[in-house]
Amino acid sequence: MILITGANGFVGHKLMELCKDTAASPSLRNVTQEMVNRMIEESNADVVVHTAAISDIGTCEADPEASYFANVQIPMYLANACKDSDRKLICFSSDQVYSACEDDGPYTEENVKPGNIYAAHKLEMEKRVLDILPSAVMLRAEWMYDYYEKRSNYLMMILNAIHTQDSVSFSSKQFRGITYLQEVAENMEKVISLPGGAYNFGSETTQSIYEVTNKFLDMLGKKLIVKDAPARHNLWMDCSKARKYGVEFSSVIDGLERCARDYKL
């Protein structure tokens, strides 16, 4: 059985929907180590997939203590509980750990330099969890998208802009992956078998997010003004480490095409 934290959230709800033999964890708000130990033990789960987090960068900057508890302390509680009961732990990290790297990328797992509190806490989480539980898997996830009205994401941003005919802004100088959430869920069975460590996790691209957006609009047959925004730091990952173990994603463009086909956009 797979116990999923954050089961009502953007990532968690899709894992609950598509993965076999899942259970939703109770809320982790204000938990203690003892509470987490009891939750894990009573779940009878073989695997814990931790998706719950405070992921808004601005929120983390405004309240670093809350960010630390949610993004570092709770994963450590889970790692201790899984270590004591010999369970596999999968934690979602972020491509933001590359947000201050000095070169342009694409970045491999060793070349990290966080540029904000959220990113720093995610990187600290990875290190502390792996110190406790070396078999744990850290997934450095990209900006994920899906047809999901409860949370803004790349797809909903584009569709809403088409509806309102507002312009969107993306930089022709920024390279980053974006990932179809369906493919995240489809890869979880292989993720569970990964050796412990950190993995770049998502779709790869050789085109800027500005180019990708224009191609996606062409694919949809829609007209929209795409402004070329000022250059932003790349979040451009090399995902070959996970791919060696069979974790496969469509390219960014192919993923968007698949998503459009799935939802008949």
Predicted feature locations:
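Mid/C-terminal beta-alpha module of Rossmann-like enzyme folds, strongest
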Residues: 187-188, 193-234, 238-239
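NAD(P)H-binding glycine-rich loop region in Rossmannoid oxidoreductase-like domains
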Residues: 32-70, 81-83
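Catalytic helix-loop patch of NAD(P)-dependent Rossmann-fold dehydrogenases
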Residues: 69, 73-77, 97-139, 145
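C-terminal amphipathic/interface module of NAD(P)-dependent oxidoreductases
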Residues: 222-225, 229-265
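NAD(P)-dependent short-chain dehydrogenase/reductase
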Residues: 127-176, 183
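SDR active-site strand-loop-helix element
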Residues: 5, 48-52, 89-95, 139-141
